[in-house]
């Protein structure tokens, strides 16, 4: 079968590891079955192959999303804890202007900071334990 994209190469059944990037994070999706063009490397997958591919994509995206947080959430938790941006930066680290950058969406906190913010959102009384 000729490639439907480049019309030059033949489509050959194979298994490949596919590089994948989401929100600046990179991974390699392992063992992706499909038909691959020997010329342009385009791929065609049947439903089963596509479902397996998408399962890996969704799992990676979920792991990346678990490490990121919306700026609005950071503002909400900081205010819930009655902290200024400066106080929050002193407690959680990241530099003197860290929370300003996080709340504007210009930077993401370290994953450990995100986890701690999530815990404090549910249990604000624990703030005194980390001060």
From Swiss-Prot:
Residues 74-127 form the HTH cro/C1-type domain. GO terms for biological process: regulation of DNA-templated transcription; single-species biofilm formation. Residues 85-104 bind DNA. Disruption phenotype: Essential for growth, it cannot be disrupted. A double mqsR-mqsA deletion leads to increased rpoS mRNA levels, resulting in increased cyclic-di-GMP levels, increasing stress resistance, increased biofilm formation. The double mutant has increased metabolism and respiration in the presence of the bile acid deoxycholate and consequently grows less well. Decreases cell survival in the presence of 20% deoxycholate. GO terms for cellular component: toxin-antitoxin complex. Binds 1 Zn(2+) ion per subunit. Changing residue 61 to A/D: Decreases DNA-binding, decreases thermostability of MqsR-MqsA complex. Pfam families: MqsA_antitoxin (PF15731). Keywords: DNA-binding, Metal-binding, Repressor, Stress response, Toxin-antitoxin system, Transcription, Transcription regulation, Zinc. Its cofactor is Zn(2+). Induction: Induced by amino acid starvation, glucose starvation and when translation is blocked. Induction is decreased in the absence of the Lon protease suggesting, by homology to other toxin-antitoxin systems, that Lon may degrade the MqsA antitoxin. Transcription is activated by MqsA. It has been suggested that MqsA represses its own operon. Not more induced in persister cells. A member of the mqsRA operon. This operon induced by ectopic expression of toxins RelE, HicA and YafQ but not by MazF or HicA. Antitoxin component of a type II toxin-antitoxin (TA) system. Labile antitoxin that binds to the MqsR mRNA interferase toxin and neutralizes its endoribonuclease activity. Overexpression prevents MqsR-mediated cessation of cell growth and inhibition of cell proliferation. Initially reported to act as a cotranscription factor with MqsA. Following further experiments, the MqsR-MqsA complex does not bind DNA and all reported data are actually due to a small fraction of free MqsA alone binding DNA. The Zn-binding N-terminal domain (residues 1-65) binds to the MqsR mRNA interferase toxin and makes contact with the DNA phosphate backbone, while the C-terminus (residues 70-131) binds the promoter in a sequence-specific manner. They are linked by a short flexible domain. This is Antitoxin MqsA.
């Amino acid at each position: 079968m000729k490639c439907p994209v480049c019309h030059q190469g033949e489509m050959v059944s194979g298994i490949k590891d596919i590089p994948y990037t989401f929100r600046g994070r990179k991974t390699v999706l392992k063992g992706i079955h499909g038909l691959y063009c020997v010329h342009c490397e385009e791929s065609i997958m049947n439903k089963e192959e596509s479902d397996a591919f998408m399962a890996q994509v969704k799992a990676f995206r979920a792991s990346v999303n678990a490490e990121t947080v919306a700026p609005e959430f950071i503002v909400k938790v900081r205010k819930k804890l009655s902290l200024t941006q400066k106080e929050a930066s002193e407690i959680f680290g990241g530099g003197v202007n860290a929370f300003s950058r996080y709340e504007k969406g210009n930077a993401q906190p370290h994953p450990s900071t995100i986890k701690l913010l999530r815990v404090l959102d549910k249990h604000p009384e624990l703030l005194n334990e980390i001060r």
